[in-house]
């Protein structure tokens, strides 16, 4: 983070016209990202082959959500300099001058410690340890290192967003098995095409901020090829998961439809040239990005449906 940019951001925050409200501090937690964390963690917890007391389950999801929010606050603290450059992020609390960087740091560190400690106490130490590692990986490995140094930033860094279902499973069972890692892999392989689609129509933002996204370092043509390759690998993984212990006929039906649409979208992106994209303001790329959000939620929703129906003999493969 450049000192000049950081000091400028700090100066604006120090002279902000209005005191920050609850909504400003809540925005530091990245609530939209937190919703994905909560949902995938919930699916991991419910899909586990054990009975969890509702109160323990609620506490587990709450503290995982707080840990995810803490990661978001620390991410915004560190990225304050580039957030004020990018159009997509310049209205965030710190660059907008509503919250001081030091406040975001204190909030992030405090919530990190609280979430890890309380998750370990409410469920088990292994779950708390995995949450601590996830926060560390997202903040230190991804935000502080990978994001600004390599075009593979979101490929490797995607692991941080893939851990919540694993943590949910461990919170329920106290140990690990193959199934939560299938959910991890699903999220991990989904992350690159999701963010590369965004980078196709937000390339100038990343370029201006000095973030080496694939579109900046290798161009849009190479990014389109990468999206297609990862989408094919993702489809194979998603369809294979249908025949695991967390899959079933409902999941298979959902996966067949979604992956057909996702592959079609990736092929359309791969076939487009820059003139077509510029002409319609990246309409296809924006549509693929929106579809990617639905893609992950519906896959995990299908896993959840299979898990909820399994006790009645209706979920899974019998």
Curated annotation (Swiss-Prot):
Keywords: Cell inner membrane, Cell membrane, Heme biosynthesis, Membrane, Transferase, Transmembrane, Transmembrane helix. Its EC number is 2.5.1.141. The chain crosses the membrane at residues 33-53, 54-74, 102-122, 125-145, 154-174, 181-201, 225-245, 246-266, 288-308. Pathway: Porphyrin-containing compound metabolism; heme O biosynthesis; heme O from protoheme: step 1/1. The keyword Protein transport does not apply. It is a multi-pass membrane protein. It is found in: Cell inner membrane. It catalyses: heme b + (2E,6E)-farnesyl diphosphate + H2O = Fe(II)-heme o + diphosphate. The keyword rRNA-binding does not apply. GO terms for biological process: heme O biosynthetic process. GO terms for cellular component: plasma membrane. PANTHER family: 4-HYDROXYBENZOATE SOLANESYLTRANSFERASE (PTHR43448:SF7), PROTOHEME IX FARNESYLTRANSFERASE, MITOCHONDRIAL (PTHR43448). Belongs to the UbiA prenyltransferase family. Protoheme IX farnesyltransferase subfamily. This is Protoheme IX farnesyltransferase. It comes from Ruegeria pomeroyi (strain ATCC 700808 / DSM 15171 / DSS-3) (Silicibacter pomeroyi). The gene is ctaB.
